[in-house]
């Protein structure tokens, strides 16, 4: 869904993403990194991140969401929750404002050549380069959205490109766990007045094409209007395979979680089991009516009862 970076050769592995929108979406409040000199640790606090469980009436149909192009397929998840309810009308849905196309240029000492709308890289060893933005910095922090396709001239070799410390890798087709990562996506925060970004091209012969680049301000990271109703967990009732707590729905809408969807998850609202749905394309949720409610989410492990009986 998010098309986050894929730094590993193994297509079954996924690292912690540096994408600030994905971090907000998954509720990552504290980000620990290193200073530019590599000597010290830094800590960034992101206040407006998604709660693990919340209520909202700001929803869009999955068919509407799936039709969105990059970068709106990322930014719209900061504004709306996605549901499988196809009866939801598109009326009133506002696309993320303030996103503008921008031109970018790769500069390197050797081995990097611009050809029409693409860039050809032919280098025998790792090459440092610079990515320059053609836009007014305005002295404020911004978000850069960058995406392009990679055509590998030597399919039996890996291709790796690091931009602003974010690595994407396309593995050799002969690799047992070929990752099929032919589209590299990078989303990053830029500091005020930052116009140049460090790039490292891995050795090989390959082409960058279909490049898309956009910038926006950081408003989308600061907006918490999606999380309209707060879920308050009960520490005594939440244990083992069960999460329980209260929520006051301000309007009819949906209960949204970042708990991966599984058919063995059960949701009860005020003691009554409700129909679970897949929300945000991958997580469990359900419909909710306005008012104060007690919610219990329980996971029933398949085969657990039989296993206990046998043992």
Q: Language model features by range: what are they?
A:
Residues 21, 35, 238-239:
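Accessory terminal regions of nucleic-acid processing enzymes
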Residues 1-22, 49, 54-83, 166-167, ...:
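Extracytoplasmic/lumenal acceptor-recognition loop(s) of multi-pass membrane glycoenzymes
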Residues 7, 11-13, 31, 248, ...:
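Mixed-charge, polar/low-complexity N-terminal
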Residues 6-8, 36-38, 48, 262, ...:
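Short, glycine-/Ser/Thr-/acidic-enriched flexible segments
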Residues 99-311:
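Active-site-proximal, structured, solvent-exposed surfaces of multi-pass membrane proteins
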Residues 1, 22-31, 257-261, 283:
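Long, contiguous hydrophobic alpha-helical segments, chiefly transmembrane helices and signal peptides
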Residues 24-30, 35-111, 207-223:
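Catalytic cores of secreted or luminal carbohydrate-active enzymes
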Residues 12-16, 24-25, 30-33, 177-179, ...:
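Active-site-proximal structural scaffolding
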């Amino acid at each position: 869904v998010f098309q986050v970076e894929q730094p590993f050769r193994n297509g079954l592995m996924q690292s912690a993403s540096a994408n600030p929108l994905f971090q907000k979406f998954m509720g990552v409040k504290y980000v620990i990194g290193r200073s530019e000199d590599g000597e010290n640790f830094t800590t960034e606090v992101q206040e407006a991140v998604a709660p693990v469980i919340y209520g909202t009436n700001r929803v869009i149909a999955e068919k509407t969401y799936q039709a969105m192009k990059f970068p709106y397929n990322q930014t719209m998840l900061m504004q709306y929750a996605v549901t499988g309810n196809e009866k939801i009308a598109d009326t009133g849905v506002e696309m993320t404002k303030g996103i503008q196309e921008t031109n970018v240029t790769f500069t390197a000492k050797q081995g990097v050549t611009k050809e029409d709308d693409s860039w050809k890289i032919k280098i025998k060893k790792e090459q440092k380069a610079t990515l320059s933005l053609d836009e007014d910095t305005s002295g404020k922090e911004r978000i850069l959205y960058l995406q392009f396709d990679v055509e590998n001239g030597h399919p039996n070799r890996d291709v790796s490109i690091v931009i602003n410390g974010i690595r994407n890798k396309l593995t050799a087709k002969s690799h047992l766990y070929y990752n099929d990562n032919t589209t590299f996506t990078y989303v990053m925060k830029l500091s005020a007045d930052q116009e140049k970004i460090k790039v490292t091209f891995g050795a090989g012969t390959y082409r960058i094409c279909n490049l898309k680049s956009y910038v926006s301000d950081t408003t989308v990271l600061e907006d918490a209007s999606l999380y309209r109703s707060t879920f308050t967990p009960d520490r005594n009732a939440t244990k083992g395979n069960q999460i329980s707590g209260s929520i006051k729905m301000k309007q009819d809408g949906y209960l949204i979680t970042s708990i991966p969807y599984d058919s063995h998850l059960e949701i009860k609202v005020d003691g009554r089991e409700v129909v679970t749905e897949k929300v945000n394309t991958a997580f469990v949720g359900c419909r909710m009516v306005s008012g104060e409610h007690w919610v219990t989410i329980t996971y029933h492990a398949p085969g657990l009862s039989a296993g206990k009986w046998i043992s």
